[in-house]
C-alpha cells in the first residue's frame, strides 16, 4: 500500500442523506503545493458521489475508469465496483496506481482500495487518506452523540481532522445526496 499524504475524505450516511467531504490540500513531500483542490465529484448523472485520496493523476485515471464501469452497468454502484476491481487486479498498469476512492449512491457506500479491494463499511461512516482516521473518530463521536445531519457531521469532522493532521487543511469541499 502507499503512503497517502495530502488528503482526507469522509463519507457519512444518516437518515435519508449521504454526504462526502474532503479537504483541499495537495502536498508533495513536506511542501503544500495547493490548498484548494477539489477531491469530491458527482458521477453518473449526479446519482453517485465520489472522493479520492492519493496521487492526483492516478485518482483521475480511477475516476475515468469507474465512470466507464458505471455507464456500462447502468449506474449500478455495486456491479460497477466489482467490474472495476476485476480489471484493477488483472491490468498491470492499474495495479501501480496509488489512489483510493470512496463512492456512495442512495443505498451503498464503498471504499475502493489501492490494491483492487472493495470494502463496504459496516456502519454509516467511511474515511480514507492521511487524516481519515482522525475524521472517522470525530464522525463516530458526533454520529452517536448528536442529532447533526450527515453533511454537518462530515464537515465538522473534517475540520477536526484539519486541526490535527498536517496533511489536511480547512478548505472543505462537501456534497450530499438527499433522500438517499
From Swiss-Prot:
PROSITE patterns documented for this protein: PROTEASOME_BETA_2 (PS51476)
Positions that bind Na(+): 162, 165, 168
Regulation: Allosterically activated by HslU binding.
InterPro entries registered for this protein in UniProt: ATP-dep_Prtase_HsIV_su, Ntn_hydrolases_N, Proteasome_sua/b, Proteasome_suB-type
Active site (UniProt): 7
Localization per record: Cytoplasm
Catalyzed reactions: ATP-dependent cleavage of peptide bonds with broad specificity
Purpose of the protein: Protease subunit of a proteasome-like degradation complex believed to be a general protein degrading machinery.
HAMAP family in alphabetical order: HslV
PANTHER family in alphabetical order: ATP-DEPENDENT PROTEASE SUBUNIT HSLV (PTHR32194:SF0), METALLOPROTEASE TLDD (PTHR32194)
Protein name: ATP-dependent protease subunit HslV
Organism: Dichelobacter nodosus (strain VCS1703A)
Gene name of the record: hslV
Amino acid at each position: 500500500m502507499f503512503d497517502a499524504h495530502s488528503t482526507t475524505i469522509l463519507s457519512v450516511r444518516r437518515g435519508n442523506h449521504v454526504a462526502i467531504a474532503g479537504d483541499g490540500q495537495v502536498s508533495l513531500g513536506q511542501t503544500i503545493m495547493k490548498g484548494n483542490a477539489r477531491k469530491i465529484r458527482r458521477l453518473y448523472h449526479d446519482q453517485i458521489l465520489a472522493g479520492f485520496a492519493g496521487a492526483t493523476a492516478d485518482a483521475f485515471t480511477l475516476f475515468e475508469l469507474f465512470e466507464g464501469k458505471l455507464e456500462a452497468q447502468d449506474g449500478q454502484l455495486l456491479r460497477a465496483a466489482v467490474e472495476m476491481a476485476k480489471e484493477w487486479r488483472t491490468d498491470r498498469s492499474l495495479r501501480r496506481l496509488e489512489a483510493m476512492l470512496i463512492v456512495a449512491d442512495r443505498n451503498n457506500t464503498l471504499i475502493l482500495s489501492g490494491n483492487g479491494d472493495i470494502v463496504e463499511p459496516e456502519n454509516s461512516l467511511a474515511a480514507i487518506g492521511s487524516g481519515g482516521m482522525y475524521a472517522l473518530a470525530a464522525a463516530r463521536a458526533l454520529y452517536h452523540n448528536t442529532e447533526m445531519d450527515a453533511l454537518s457531521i462530515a464537515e465538522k469532522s473534517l475540520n477536526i481532522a484539519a486541526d490535527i493532521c498536517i496533511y489536511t487543511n480547512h478548505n472543505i469541499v462537501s456534497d450530499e445526496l438527499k433522500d438517499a
